[in-house]
Amino acid sequence: MSDVFELENEIELESDEVIMENENVEEIVDAPMPFSMTTNNGVERGKFRSLTLINWNGFFARTFDLDELVTTLSGGNGAGKSTTMAGFVTALIPDLTLLHFRNTTEAGSTGGSRDKGLHGKLRPGVCYAVLDTINSRHQRILVGVRLQQIAGRDKKVDLKTFSIQGVELSQNPTALFTETVGERQARVLNLNELKDKIENIGAQFKQYHSITDYHGMMFDLGIIPKRLRSASDRSKFYKLIEASLYGGISSAITRSLRDYLLPENLGVRKAFQDMESALRENRMTLEAIKVTQSDRNLFKHLITETTNYVASDYMRNANERRGNIEAALESRREWYKAKAEQNLSQHRLVDLSREAAELAENERTLEVDHQSAVDHLNLVLNALRHQEKITRYQEDIAELTERLEEQKIVVEDANDALEESQAQFEQTEIEIDAVRAQLADYQQALDAQQTRALQYQQAITALEKAKTLCGLADLSVKNVEDYHAEFEAHAESLTETVLELEHKMSISEAAKSQFDKAYQLVCKIAGEIPRSSAWESAKELLREYPSQKLQAQQTPQLRTKLHELEQRYAQQQSAVKLLNDFNQRANLSLQTAEELEDYHAEQEALIEDISARLSEQVENRSTLRQKRENLTALYDENARKAPAWLTAQAALERLEQQSGETFEHSQDVMNFMQSQLVKERELTMQRDQLEQKRLQLDEQISRLSQPDGSEDPRLNMLAERFGGVLLSELYDDVTIEDAPYFSALYGPARHAIVVRDLNAVREQLAQLEDCPDDLYLIEGDPTAFDDSVLSAQELELGVVVQVSDRELRYSRFPEIPLFGRAAREKRLEELQIERDEVAEQYAQIAFDVQKCQRLHEHFSQFVGLHLALAFQPNPEELMSEINRERNEIDRELNQFNNGEQQLRIQLDNAKEKLQLLNKLIPQLNVLTDEDLIDRIEECREQLDIAEQDEYFIRQYGVTLSQLEPIANSLQSDPENYDGLKNELTQAIERQKQVQQRVFALADVVQRKHHFGYEDAGQAKTSELNEKLRQRLEQMQAQRDMQREQVRQKQSQFAEYNRVLIQLQSSYDSKYQLLNELISEISDLGVRADDGAEERARIRRDELHQQLSTSRQRRSYVEKQLTLIESEADNLNRLIRKTERDYKTQRELVVAAKVSWCVVLRLSRNSDMEKRLNRRELAYLSADELRSMSDKALGALRTAVADNEYLRDSLRVSEDSRKPENKVRFFIAVYQHLRERIRQDIIKTDDPIDAIEQMEIELSRLTAELTGREKKLAISSESVANIMRKTIQREQNRIRMLNQGLQNISFGQVKSVRLVVNIRDTHAMLLDALSGQQDEYQDLFNDNCITFSEAMAKLYQRINPHIDMGQRTAQTIGEELLDYRNYLELEVEVFRGADGWLRAESGALSTGEAIGTGMSILLMVVQSWEEESRRIRGKDIVPCRLLFLDEAARLDGKSISTLFELCERLDMQLLIAAPENISPEKGTTYKLVRKIAGNQEHVHVVGLRGFGATE
């Protein structure tokens, strides 16, 4: 009979809490059978006891007890079967990225519902899914997940994983997660309340914050078969559960069977570990070196830049503070100095103002005198110009007078000639008229008689005319010639008389002109006087003329004499003025020459004395200045040496700190260096010994680390060649307790090779070339080998083996067994510990060696750079002493300068007095000349007389010289001149009358023959007419000639007369100008002599020079006054400025003192003052320090960009007004660096020492890297052998798995198996790796690529037809190092008449596919357990459970096969089946979903042991 139990639940909500009412609880008819545990090699397998769902949809608080084998959930559609399984899977794999609960109709889909099937299966509030398990250690563990819906459109669910341990087996899981609040009500506890409840009952509650930790706990406690380290492992596990849940052959699993069935590289990876791990360690070492370098560089960079940044600002502030103090003191000194200068300037202003007033008054006087001198000079110049004009005009007038006289004579001659020519012309005109009349009369006659008659008549007329003119009544033709001769003689006598009168007239005219000229000259000189007194006046003038002429000639000498006297007088006045000035300046009253000469001698002596004293002081000052320059040069030399000396001292101090020694002399440094060399040699020997020991241990570890336990790699090649397996590999799984027995059992043959046929191998032994000295071969089946081949007896300390009938071998149990992986691993652990100890000792000794080397290097650098300076005296102390000496010298120099200034003032005063005396002494004789003024007056009177005579001579000298030769003509006045002139006129008239009579008589004489025509005069008429005509023509020609002569003489007379008029006009104008000039020069009132201009100019220049000197002095004084006034303003401003600067500087000093005190307090309290007070920076300028600080600031901004705290601290420190923030930043950096120091490597808190130790550590790591590089010499052949061994072992394991699947049958499927094959491309790769082709060795000898990359490149070489895609060589190489990529796995089934064929869903029925898929999943789980056996506790066998939803597709036989499979493989199975399915075995739950009002719940009835028997 079966036991029946039923539990009904109703759910209702009260006050927002989920309440449970138990309406009907039926007691279980027969109590559940106790949960039994099956054993696995003596270890019981863990089991899932129950599944508890709290507040799921339809299940408020339901616990499903799970059967040991099969638990069936039976019910209709929507009853809750899938929900129950979803709760189980959620508790098993609580990963929302994987969970996707779809029904079988959406199998293979990737989308599904939006909430992936979980959100809709939960109710609002807190939900739980809990698995109750009991593991191989009989520990009860409750693992589960708290679920809660998250409000929102995305239908998200929040998961919290937890575990509970220590709960009694009798405790119901439902009671743990709910709290009863009434007889029929309960509420769900939240996670915190659950934690409190579990802790109250004494159990352990643990919540997990990652799925990896949750699964790690489940693996450690034996709940899941495999450690799920990553999301990929969880995905595989979920795919396996999903494939199990939905049934069938999962393509996701079959496509990647290698990943599920084959374990990760254990053999190959372990073999490859020797090289790849070494590479990895090398890379880690490189990374460590990089990290160390980065830390070291960071430390160096931060310390250097921070020190530069803060120390430069610290020293700049210190310099500025010192500079501000000095500036304040300097401002105060300038303030006091400006006040003293102001007082001195005020006194000087008063003195200069008084002098300026005196100079102004003197200048006004000099200006008046100078203007007078200028005016006098102008008058003299005007007078000289007038005198020059007078002289020129006098000369011109004299010349004009002579020319005028000459011109008058010429005009008179021309006039006489003109009158004579006119008279002749008129006579010729009369004769022409007479001839014309005769000719006219002749022409009137018609014939010759008439003409003769006319001629006769004309002759009579001419006779009558002659009678009339001559007054001769008796004149006739006969006596006409006599009368003509008489009258002609009378005419000649009259002509002689006229000529005589003309001669007398010319003589009279000459006498008269001389008299008139002399009279005019006398009147010109003496004025208008009677003609009678002219001779007396002329005689008086001529008598005085020689004395006046002589006096006039003496005028220049008198002028020169007067000029010399006036100069002497001017010198006398100048000397008087100099004497007065000298007395005034010297405050003396010296008057006599003796007194002046004595004082002159005193001043010369004084000047010599002062000059001697001054030269002595100059020499002393020069000596002091030379001494000061020497001190300055010495100071500069020490100032140049000071930074280097300070740097050397800092280096020496660091060396003393590093070495712990104190060095007083350079020889101490050299001795210490020698001792360090000795110590370094000793430590190097210890290091080499430890290195040798470490290498031996590494060799043993490497030999024991072989996966098959072979110590000789040649054995692997021989085993592969013979087709056998190493004996050590067969006993690889032997326990550590049995390891001594088996090691002694086989003795020397523990490294034998197990082969199937010794005879086949014996033939190959002769061909062996490279093999161990002793090679043991044992015949047997490697897949089923045991120790029955040997006859052995175990003793207390060893084993006796019957080798043959006549040979026994006794082998003692080894103290350190190495047979079997467990023994080797134990020995490896011991060797690893020993190696770690040796490595630690080696590292310490190597560190000490490096430390010695670094210390010696530092000492060498110190010797090379600083030894010459480090032990010299302190330059700063010398500089202080030099400063004191320089200050003393400066004080002495100031005293010398003051004394020298006073001496120079005395010397200048003495020289000025001496200069005045030198000017005054040569003029002493002038001062004593008392009658100088009288002589000047006398000379001036003589000069006035002489100048008057000179003026008279200059004015009338020419006139007197003209008068002197003709003065005698004045003695008699020519009074008969007019009578003679009348007589001459009368004689000329008579001459004209006589000549007319002569002409008339001559006409009658010429016509005398005409008288004969009285009777017959007609015959000669024509001849007479012709003669008349000829005569008329002659007379006309003569008239024309005379007319031309008259015209010429008229023009000549006009020209001469015009010249005369011009001369007269010029004479009159110049004479008038001369009179005007004489009047003007008389009005000027000055003497225009030759020296007048020179004297006037000299006087003017002297006054101008005096005025200029006075003006210059006054200008200088006024400039000095202006300068003093401006300087007074400047001094006032300077006083205010210096006072303000002093107060400002004092405020700065006071204000900076507060901040400086804070800086000092911070630096001293943090022990940073010594690092900040870098004295060598004190010798840099503020700009250089600021530039250093700015550069360091820029570098620090980059360095601390990733550190928020330091970045903020640096930003705050940039405020220049608060230098203490920079010190705080410095402290923060040091604190940060102290925190960054790796205490496991560096044993110091000081970052400076940390840098040193980092250097040492870096050298050690570099040496270690070099050593490890030598270990990377693994060959490609060994890798290929290990890979083949691993593949062979896995093939054997797959064959063992196939044995468990041989008897499985589902429908027509009678058997299932796995087929393992090696890929052709990878087989070629293995052949290439194990071959001896030199063409491939270049890849593995290249140090620039890793072994993985070399593998990838080799794979590409031998398979050029395969496209590698975008994958890198490293990725491909890593895949090639995984032996699973060399294998192809396929699932085959033996189905009916088809025989063995590939297992595919299309070739199998649904039930066959489900069964086949379940078989594959069981194989995977079994493989996982085997793979994880080493990393799992030896007393743990994990739970084994699979799912199957919708089991209706399986027939009863198939279900029975599943039950059998579960029983045979010790597996639990959870299936879901329709209502009509009732398995014979296991536990079955009937699920019915009921609805009551608006509430629904699932009614569950559990059946155990239900089934029918045939």
Curated annotation (Swiss-Prot):
Parts forming coiled coils: 6-30, 346-506, 553-633, 673-706, 821-847, 876-1064, 1094-1149, 1249-1305
GO BP of this protein: cell division; chromosome condensation; chromosome segregation; DNA replication
Signal peptide start-end: none
Primary residence: cytoplasm
InterPro entries: MukB (IPR012090), MukB/SMC (IPR050308), MukB_hinge (IPR032520), MukB_hinge_sf (IPR042501), MukB_N_dom (IPR007406), P-loop_NTPase (IPR027417)
UniProt GO molecular function: ATP binding; DNA binding
Keyword Secreted carried by entry: no
Spans annotated as Flexible hinge: 707-824
Alphabetical keyword list: ATP-binding, Cell cycle, Cell division, Chromosome partition, Coiled coil, Cytoplasm, DNA condensation, DNA-binding, Nucleotide-binding
GO CC aspect terms: cytoplasm; nucleoid
Cellular localisation: Cytoplasm, Nucleoid
Pfam families: MukB, MukB_hinge, SbcC_Walker_B
Gene3D superfamilies (UniProt xref): 1.20.58.850, 3.40.1140.10, Immunoglobulin FC, subunit C, MukB, hinge domain
Positions with a binding annotation for ATP: G75, G76, N77, G78, A79, G80, K81, S82
Record's subunit section: Homodimerization via its hinge domain. Binds to DNA via its C-terminal region. Interacts, and probably forms a ternary complex, with MukE and MukF via its C-terminal region. The complex formation is stimulated by calcium or magnesium. Interacts with tubulin-related protein FtsZ.
HAMAP family: MukB
Entry similarity comment: Belongs to the SMC family. MukB subfamily.
This protein's domain notes: The hinge domain, which separates the large intramolecular coiled coil regions, allows the homodimerization, forming a V-shaped homodimer.
Function: Plays a central role in chromosome condensation, segregation and cell cycle progression. Functions as a homodimer, which is essential for chromosome partition. Involved in negative DNA supercoiling in vivo, and by this means organize and compact chromosomes. May achieve or facilitate chromosome segregation by condensation DNA from both sides of a centrally located replisome during cell division.
Record NCBIfam families: PRK04863.1 (NF003422)
Protein's name in the database: Chromosome partition protein MukB
Originating species: Haemophilus influenzae (strain 86-028NP)
